[in-house]
Each structure stands twice: as C-alpha cells, then as structure tokens.
C-alpha cells in the first residue's frame, strides 16, 4: 500500500473498486484544493466520468474514417487557433504542443493538425506500448507531408528528437505527469511543492524550440479549447514552472476536467 502525506492527512493510493476510487479522488481533491467533502466528492465523480469519456473518444476515433474524425474534431470551439496555426506555418522554429490530460485534448490536437500546412514531422512522445487502437487513432493525424512518428519512453531517442526540433519539426508531449514518467523537478503546482516531469521543457531548451500550451474543456455537450501564449524556453526549471502555472490556473477554474488527480500523491512524494 502506498500512502502520501498532506499535512497530517494520509491518502491511500491503492484503489480496488469504483467507489473506493471516487473516495480516493475525493480525498486528494479535498486536501489539495481545500474543498469541503461534498464539493470534493462532486469533483471526484465528474473527473472520473471525464476520464471514461476521454477513453471513449479514443475508441470512437479508432472506428472512424478520416472524414468522420475530422468532422468530430471540427466541432471544438478553438480560441486563437487561426493565429497559432499561422504562427506555426510561418515560423522556422520547432514547437512543442503541450497541455494537460483534460477535456478533449486529443480532438484539440487533431483540429490543430488539420490547420498545419508546412511540411514537418510531428513526434508524439508516448509511454504506453504500441497498440492497434493507437495506430488507428494516429492514422487520422498522419499524411505524406506531415507524418506522425511515435517515440516511446525508453527508446533512447532524445537526441534524435532534439535534432528534429532544431530543424523546425514539431513534438507533442503533455506535462501533467509524475516522476515515474521521466526526469522531474520540484515545482509549485496547485499551491504545493510537487515533483513534475520536465521533459517538454528540457526538449524545448535543448531543441531551441517554442512551447505551445493549450487547454481543453467539455461542458454541457460542447468541446472547447484555447491556446495560451507560446513560451520561449530559458532554463529548464523556469520554463517548467511556467507550464505548471498554466496548468494550475486551468485546474483551479476547471477541477472537474483534469483527469490526472490520481497522480497527485506521487507528485507530492508518495513512494
């Protein structure tokens, strides 16, 4: 059994059933956001439902043809999409698309992909093993001029990705992950000192690339997404902290949308 301490409270991160899982999420949310138990439970139920809905989007995309997938992604109301797409299509710099596991992040990336016109490679950083479902979903992002190249954690291809960024190619890597997913640093996240991965920021510094953060929501049957101001990387930790600030501000406004509450105990130091 793994436990994390927040103040004088213990969080049990071993989950054996749906009810136990909701109780666990409720504890995490209540202690981190200092919410009363009823509100924390409401958020826990909502975020668990969001995670299930997100998995269903993956399954749905895997059964669609290209035009159906594009139609689904085009339903997203995407703020600043035209401006960011114009910037990406004309800039010679590499870029890293990064965000949280929240809302319809996958469809947001697909809609962005449909607006890219300059031939580049897109490198997708993934930890999960390859699967037929993944291949079918990523086929909607792939074409001759802008091919998708999946890079697995542990493939020892960091330098290849860095070289690609320096040549102006793109990378997709989300940043709301604990240290078990890669190199991490202690950063301020949700007003707590947490161990957060620094991979996207490290790649941006080494690859002399811009970070392009985005957020996504799904409320009342409508998906929306928004690009944040692109970040010009400086030092790894300073850049990673900027991403954490973007993520914290989003989660404070939309706690029900974030799907990675279950990682918080590890981020706080649970082993």
Question: Which residue stretches match the model-derived regions?
Answer:
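Membrane-anchoring hydrophobic helices of lipid-metabolizing enzymes
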Residues: 1-104, 137-140
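Short amphipathic alpha-helical segments and helix-helix/interface helices
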Residues: 84-88, 109-114, 137-143, 161-162, ...
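Short acidic-hydrophobic, aromatic-tinged amphipathic segments that line or gate anion-handling sites
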Residues: 76-81, 147-155, 232
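Short, contiguous strand/loop micro-motifs
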Residues: 12-13, 71, 125, 148, ...
């Amino acid at each position: 059994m793994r436990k994390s301490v927040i103040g004088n409270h213990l969080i049990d991160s071993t989950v054996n059933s749906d009810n136990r899982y909701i109780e666990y999420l409720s504890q995490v949310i209540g202690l981190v956001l200092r919410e009363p138990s009823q509100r924390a439970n409401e958020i826990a139920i909502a975020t668990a439902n969001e995670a299930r809905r997100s998995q269903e989007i993956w399954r749905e995309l895997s059964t669609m043809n290209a035009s159906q997938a594009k139609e689904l992604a085009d339903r997203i109301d995407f703020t600043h999409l035209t401006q960011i797409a114009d910037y990406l299509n004309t800039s010679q710099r590499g870029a890293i698309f990064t965000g949280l596991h929240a809302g319809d992040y996958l469809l947001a990336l697909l809609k962005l992909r449909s607006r890219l016109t300059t031939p580049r490679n897109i490198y997708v950083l993934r930890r999960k093993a390859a699967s037929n479902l993944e291949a079918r979903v990523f086929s909607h992002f792939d074409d001759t001029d802008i091919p998708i190249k999946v890079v697995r954690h542990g493939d020892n291809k960091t330098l290849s990705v860095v070289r690609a960024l320096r040549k102006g190619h793109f990378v997709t890597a989300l940043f709301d992950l604990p240290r078990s997913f890669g190199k991490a640093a202690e950063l301020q996240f949700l007003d707590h000192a947490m161990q957060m991965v620094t991979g996207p920021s490290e790649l941006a510094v080494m690859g002399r690339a811009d970070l392009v953060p985005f957020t996504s929501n799904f409320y009342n049957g409508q998906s929306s997404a928004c690009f944040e101001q692109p970040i010009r990387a400086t030092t790894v930790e300073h850049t990673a902290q900027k991403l954490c600030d973007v993520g914290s501000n989003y989660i404070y406004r939309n706690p029900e949308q974030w799907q990675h509450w279950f990682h918080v105990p590890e981020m706080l130091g649970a082993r």
